[in-house]
Amino acid sequence: NRGTKATVFACHVPHPERFGVIEFDRNFRASSIEEKPKNPKSSYVTVGLYFYPGDVVERARQLVPSTRGELEITDLNNQYLREGKISVVPMRRGNIWLDAGTPASLMEASMFISLVEQRQGVKVACIEEVAYRMEFIDDEQMMNLIREMKAGTSYRDYLEKVYKERY
């Protein structure tokens, strides 16, 4: 379906009126998507992670600004919804989405990431590590990335540790 359908990720939140809200039917299929509604129809919201088919650029070019004066991603998602070309994937228990849309939520997200990294000794969302562990890059490519970084930085030191752990 990834070639023809849009995929939207969703999360249950306590204050959905601040986000794009997704309403579901009995079979847990999206029935509506509404941007920052005063009276949300559900507590599930889009988390800002989307996969789109190849026609997305042309569709985006045709969007018109909303009453708020913005091009709304919700309008794009609603095009796919009306055509039955959207899948909504709810985030499962154990996954976390961190809102960073207000100064307070950005601070909370930063503190959470810092705590996880300190307590577990791992980096969160280290793209080089993810690419290496998933074998999108090989040993030589990983070492080239490491060598390009300034020596003695904690990030480079971390990647060197990741590289050495593999052997």
Feature map (PLM): residue ranges:
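Unchanged
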Residues: 1-167
